[in-house]
Every structure is written in C-alpha cells, then in structure tokens.
Amino acid sequence: RCVGHTTKLATSGIARTISMRQTRLVSFFERNRQELKAKGLDASRLPPGQYLTDRFPVLHVGDIPSYAPGQWNLSIGGLVDAPFVLSLDELKALPSVTLTYDIHCVTKWSKFDTTWTGVRVRDLFAMAGVKPEATHVMEHAEFGYTTNVPLADITTDEAIVAYEFDGAEIEPIHGGPVRIVVPHLYFWKSAKWVRSLEVLDRDVAGFWERNGYHMYGDPFLEQRFWGD
C-alpha cells in the first residue's frame, strides 16, 4: 500500500510538472501574439505554433561552405529541354526582383517583412524549357543536402533564387552566396547554398523529408512532420 501511495504521488508530481511546462509554453505563444496586437501587427500573419522574432536564428546541418571568387555556380537540369549552368555574375545579370515577405522556420520562429533580391525561379525554368511531364523540383545544395518542392510552388511570383537579403549580399551563415526562397512553405524548403535545381516527374523525398519531415510543409497547416 505504501508503494502504491508513493507511486501515485510520483505520478501526480510528474503530471503537475508537465502541466506547468505546457502552461508556460502556451503562455509564451499567447504573450507573443498579444505583443503583435499591441504593435498593431496582424496576428493572422503568424502561423499556429509559431512565435515572432526580430532576430534571424541560424540553424543548419554541417559546415558553412566558403567559395573563392568565381567558384560558385548554379545548374538547371532534369526534365528540361536545354540544361544550363550559370556563374554568380551571370545570375546577377538576369532581370531581378526585390520582394518583401514573412518567413517561417519549422523550429517555430517566424520573421516578418524580410526583403530579398534575386531571380524568379520560373524565369530560369523558362530559359531551360520545362518538359510537360514535370511535377516537382529537387533543390540540391552543398554537402549533399536536398529538399523537394512541387513545381507549382517554386514557380510562383514570390519564389526566387536569392543573392541579397535586406539590400546586402546574403551572409554565408544565412545561405550565401545564393539560396532559394519559397516563402509560403516552412523555410527548410528554401535551401541554403543551393547549387542546382533538378526538375522531376514525381515527388521524391529530400534530406529532411527522409528523416521525418513533411513532404510539403505548409506552416499554416503545421505540416512539420510525417503524418501532420
């Protein structure tokens, strides 16, 4: 009877601890949304389970690559009529856009009103001639990192191959010299240090997708992991 009583006390103690932690976590997100409203910001811009930060957290796997001048290039290939490779100077010589949008990381932070400059992915694909059977794109980055995106999502007005952030070259820690930006999906779908875009006729899991992350990654549906 004593053992049972002790077990009940221990169990109830664990339950209280979990409850308190959950309450603190919920309160943090609630406070963050209240702060948005106090600043006159539209809280509906913040996906569920996210918090707003003014910082730009750095999260990645592996080392940060470095490039000698002229070393970086981007290849466009797969199911296209005319594959090609661009140097950084050639990429920057193409018609560019400067766009401002919110970004959302799967690790729960969001950052509003980020400004990026680059070339629309759809313009690069127009140069290559995407074959009619194409449905998806694999982003290939340094060190073998990959992530998959539907063709329709990476060819919107907002999806770009970016080389500037807030008016300056993208810092290496944030994916420079060039990264993808697909702002309406969780930000792991916007590969840092991108080196090639491969057009596919099917959906193929990339690095994180093979390791439990969602194949699509809509932040407003909280599609973080398999089954979400």
Put a short name on every predicted segment.
Residues 21-228:
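Structured, non-membrane catalytic/scaffold regions adjacent to prosthetic-group chemistry
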